[in-house]
């Protein structure tokens, strides 16, 4: 939680809780702590795949995978939640839009060990194709670093989503601040 608070102190305005190996109880308990933190900093909290838990803890939204329940079904059952969907192709982006997503992530843009299972990097040209093809905010994800953000934005990304470059920093608060200060910090 200290690292999350450091990102929030650095100005990050959205956090996604993505802990697939926790029990429901553990997820709820961690979610409650994160909700308190994010609320204190005026940031949004998204829960990975679990709209029921997102609603239970008062999170702002849920983030779905391409293979999970459709966004419009989540919105029908949980109308107050912002619904995002992970996408890994132009077809997936179109599908997420037609199924009612509020935003999408598109990945991996660059080489990254955490997204290796999704195949080779999509690259900036694919990012541009997606951003021009859908009307949703598109967050570039995968291998994002400070020096790569400008080219993602130039290729139409609304913003970026990342883990490693901030988490692996020895100065999380300051590194988070650099992202938010230098690139406008678009948030959903």
Map each language-model feature to its residues.
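Conserved N-terminal beta1-alpha1 strand-loop-helix module at the mouth
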Residues: 1-102, 119, 129, 135-136, ...
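Short beta-strands and strand-loop turn motifs
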Residues: 14-18, 105-113, 160-162
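Nucleotide-sugar donor-binding patch of glycosyltransferase catalytic domains
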Residues: 116
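Short alpha-helical segments enriched in small residues
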Residues: 121-124
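Glycine-rich beta-strand-to-loop/alpha-helix junction loops that act as flexible
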Residues: 139-144, 160-164
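Asp-centered catalytic/switch region of ABC-type ATPase nucleotide-binding domains
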Residues: 157
